[in-house]
């Protein structure tokens, strides 16, 4: 029983460490989300061009099924 508890605690600590390491750094977080459309999900170039038109560096389709146009910071 004691060994089982130690294994469970070890697994929980490993999960916590991996979840913390998987969090994106502040510089990797998307800075501007635009409502759905602007080419997503089928035309990522249209999203990129939209973001360029609003004076952002570029953009990409993000989300579960890539329906949200997300723009890069300047």
Swiss-Prot record:
The keyword Transmembrane helix does not apply. Disulfide bonds join 40-61, 47-69, 51-71. The keyword Nucleotide-binding does not apply. GO terms for biological process: defense response to Gram-negative bacterium; defense response to Gram-positive bacterium. Its main location: secreted. Residues 23-36 form a propeptide. Belongs to the invertebrate defensin family. Type 2 subfamily. This is Defensin.
